Structure formats: C-alpha cells, structure tokens
Amino acid sequence: MKRRTALLLACAMACTMITGCGKKEEAPQQATEQAAAVEADTDADVIADRTRNLLTGLPATEEEASKRPVGIMIENTQSAMPSYGITRADVIYEFPVEGGITRFLALYSDYSGMDRIGSIRSSREYFAYTAIAYDAIYVHCGGSIETYNNILDLGLVDNCDARIKSGFTYRSSDRKSPHNLSTSSEDIDSIIEKLGYATEHDASYAGALNFNKDNDNEVTLDDGEDAAVVVAYQAHPKPWFVYNEEDGLYYRYQFGEPQVDGIDGSQVA
C-alpha cells in the first residue's frame, strides 16, 4: 500500500510541475528527485514487524514470524467428521458454499508433525482471496470455475491443487469418497518444494490482522451470562460456542455435539 501511495504521489507531483510551468527544463528533474526521495523513505518504512506471529499476534522468533502460512480447505459436513488437524489451525474462516453447507479455510503458521490433515475439499473464489490476503500457500482439491478463471489460472496465489498435482494427498479407508481426502505435514512440505514456492514472506508483508501490542489488561467475562453461550448462525450445521470460565476459551459445538479433532479428540476452541 505504501509503495502504491508513493507512486501516486510521484505521478501527482510530476503532473503539477509540468502543468504549472515555472522552469520547464527543471520540472521533470525535480519530479524524479522527489519521487526517488519518497520511494527511499517508503523502503525504510515497509520493513514489517517480525517479532510476533502474524496469525496470532503472540511473540515469535524472526524465523517463525517470517514463515508463510499454509491455508487448507477443510470440509465441514457430518460425513467428514471428525476433521483432522483442525485444532492446530491458528485462524479458521467458515464460509457458506452451495447446498446449505459451510466449509473451512484453516490457516496454519505451524503445521508440522501431523500425519493426517483433512478432509480436503475444493475451493471457492472468496476462500482463495482470503488465502491471498494472508500470503498463504493454498492447499485444495479443485474449485469453482470462477476460482480458476479469476485467480488460479492467473497465478495470483501459490496453490497446491490435488486435482492437478498428485502425490501429496491420499484417500483414507474410514469414510467414503469424496469425504476422505487427506494430506500430511511431510506431503505439504514435499509439494511446496516441488513447485518451488517461497516459504518466507517478503520483507514488506505486514500481515492481514492488526493486534494490540500493549495489552496489559486481562480479558475476562464480566457478568457474562449473556455471552456464556454464543450462537454463530442458525443454518446447517447450527454451530454454537460455550464459554469455559476456567480457561477463558469458547468451545465450539455443531451437529448437536462437540466439534473435536480426529487426531487427539480435543475440542475446537
């Protein structure tokens, strides 16, 4: 954004000087010098903070904060329950898709050590745009026509498409297709290396979220009867969240029961 502002500023200054006609020969040179000065200042300003995780806002090493996240399309139907690796995600977006169901985009800053992540499903345009905002490497299996025409075929996102690239996903035997497509941490690393995608953010990338860096106040649920149970929406799968006073977390339920991770049985919170 700052680079774009610098460019617009330089163009505006050049136009003003040319149409103002003071010293005709000096105007282009002045515009060039001022544009260069603005660009130099911009370069100094766009070095992003690398002391915090860009997905959680929590303290992180420079290496951890510089690593690009992986965004994985996860199915959210009863036929695909339980999901695997869902509680390891730092950020989860839930959007509606066709047929009155929803689907997840799970974003991971650290996806290591998992033998099974899924079930993986196809992309929609708005999921892919969200992955772009996070500078994520996008894992999915196929997608809508709009996703291919407007994003994937134009190379706007680094994506690992199981419909096109084989070898980094597998079908499990515990459920029927198409609800049984999974991947693993090692498989993701392998396909990223094979496709030659960068694994670190550019120095100027500052993240998609803004966090309060100086929050010394403990967050509590004061007189939280009205917020003890939160109903997200009434459509299928009718999820709701229940506040746990002991750990200060909201635990998710859907399909009439706790939403758990198939890896270890932990509940989504």
Model-derived segments and spans:
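Positively charged n-region of N-terminal signal peptides that target proteins for export
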Residues: 1-10
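C-terminal motif of bacterial Sec signal peptides marking the signal peptidase cleavage site
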Residues: 16-20
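Bacterial signal peptide processing site
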Residues: 22-24
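A surface/extracellular/periplasmic glyco- and lipid-processing/surface-interacting theme
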Residues: 35-93, 98-269
